[in-house]
């Protein structure tokens, strides 16, 4: 049977951390509880979250990223050949609050270790999800490691092995191929790659800043599609791999603005993922015209914001779905919130009740628009 993901109404992945999670993480960092005690709290809270996800009617469920500090760093720090580093500031500036100044650098040959902690995290999610839903695993796109270490960083010096950048790209692809196979072996059939690089490359301001440093972001984008397509060669037929594209989501703030046109042909026209989750909740994302480059991929429209509590009007969202269907057939479209509710452990400036109201709205709209 064909894997139906992404679903007509779906989620990006992260949820607001509960009070118990916040308290346990604080105690763990202060040395007041052990790693085992922290895991016990996380397990209990994730079990409760999955029940709530099922109760709201979701077909795909996640662990809310409850075990992570960041949507991306925890995974990247777990790769062989990377190192967690403290820095003076986060790797990208947000319009408002700034995240913790922790980043990553490449210090050795890249690889995906057999004991990467996320494999155990997925196994637990699968163990508490019912047979009626599909557990979904979200990890950062490979582009993020290259973007943070080699593009955003103004003082990047490649290690000896990576003086030829092609070797780096091929090692990165091989590491992620191993990740895909390992998650598949663990039972994962729905994997999402989260990626803010394309959001940056949509920004005229950021494109100009990179150009002034001698960086051709279109060329970088082509390299990322090369890596992504190499990874997708390892994807078994009954596994779905999607990509979520974001313009930043930290405590309800953002980091990039600009429509998809600058990256549309390179990304939508050539990247072989099964679907794109696309942020479309504000005018910062531009119009739907760039979707004309979409081929067979499904497009999950992020028309409902996760950044504030105000509920969108159903008729407005439905009108926008109809508008998007001028460029992509309605049967290839789906609906989700624009991003997660807590891309970092701090979370967006919304309440627990708000996030469930948003998901209920997404489900109700999808049921009105699509018969299936």
Which residues does each PLM region occupy?
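Domain-level signal for soluble alpha/beta catalytic cores
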Residues: 1-372
